[in-house]
Amino acid sequence: MDAFQSILKFFLNQKTAIGYSFMALLTVGSERLFSLVAFKCPCSIENTAYGLVFLFAPAWVLLILGFFLNNKAWRLFTGCCMNPQKIFPRRRCCRFFYVLGHITLSSLVAPVMWLSVALLNGTFYECAMSGTRSTRLLEMICKGKPKECWEELHKVSCGKSSMAAMDSEEVRLSLQAQSQILGWCLICSASFFSLLTTCYARCRSKVSYLQLSFWKTYAQREKEQLENKLLEYANKLSERNLKCFFENKKPDPFPMPSFAAWEAASELHSFHQDREHYSTLHKVVDDGLEQTPQEEETTMILVGTAQSL
């Protein structure tokens, strides 16, 4: 039993890495499925449009899904049309762009994975580049090749070109090599940028490493317990209402947070060094509805947590 709990604890502690690994495997599988089942290069002047659509359209869909599935995005935008100060509070307008930037970076993970895998495979890029009409690109691709390369480049990816088999294979390998080089450049750039932004966020942290670790643990536990409490109180309230309805009785008072309390607890968290609140809910419970002066607050997002604080 102890061994099972240790294994479970290990997986819970590494769930972020496991999640990214699962996302990478899912991306690789999806790309291979697209390449083998859905992708059929037309071998015509439409090659460029067809290849680029298969290369970038799934990445765009993944980006949109990333925003849809990001809880921080909905926490940021819910009710903003009715009360614009939720996202643009006084003297803290930059906070909105800071949080939006963090949401965007999180949503870009899946699209970058897709583009990287697709470029490393080379199928989509090969089809797209074989349909180019750019003289400059044709000179680069068909350098040292017969004139048929200029006229029938769009047929190379299908093996229907009148060029010699060796020349046609060299062109295909050259296009695939270009695609793989771009793929590795994208992976290296994304990795370096991720490291850079993480280091910058840690360097700008207002709390120490140990306090940050405690903050992450608290945020996760609060999130789990909040979900349980929401379910518990929803069950109690629905049970009370149904019972009173069917028994035709007047309901007893049911303690619930006020509308203002719900609004205050739903705001983005701003860290105050003199008053160490680890979440918006923590702040509301300690201070009620009194607001801390906003110019003394600093918006912070915990890297690697599932909740915006």
UniProtKB/Swiss-Prot annotation:
Keywords in alphabetical order: Disulfide bond, Ion channel, Ion transport, Membrane, Transmembrane, Transmembrane helix, Transport
Transmembrane segments: 16-37, 46-70, 100-129, 175-200
Domain of life assignment: Eukaryota
One GO cellular component term noted in the UniProt record for this chain: plasma membrane
Localization (cell): Membrane
An MF annotation (GO) of this entry: monoatomic cation channel activity
Signal peptide coordinates: none
Membrane topology of this protein: Multi-pass membrane protein
Record-annotated disulphide pairs: C41-C127, C43-C158, C142-C149
Main subcellular location of this protein, as a coarse class: membrane
Ranges of the Cytoplasmic topological domain: 1-15, 71-99, 201-309
Extracellular face of the membrane: 38-45, 130-174
Pfam families on file: Ca_hom_mod (PF14798)
Function description: May assemble to form large pore channels with gating and ion conductance likely regulated by membrane lipids.
Family classification: Belongs to the CALHM family.
Subunit structure: Oligomerizes to form undecameric cone-shaped channels.
Name of the protein this chain belongs to: Calcium homeostasis modulator protein 5
Species in which this protein is naturally found: Rattus norvegicus
Taxonomic lineage of the native organism: Eukaryota, Metazoa, Chordata, Craniata, Vertebrata
Gene that produces this protein: Calhm5
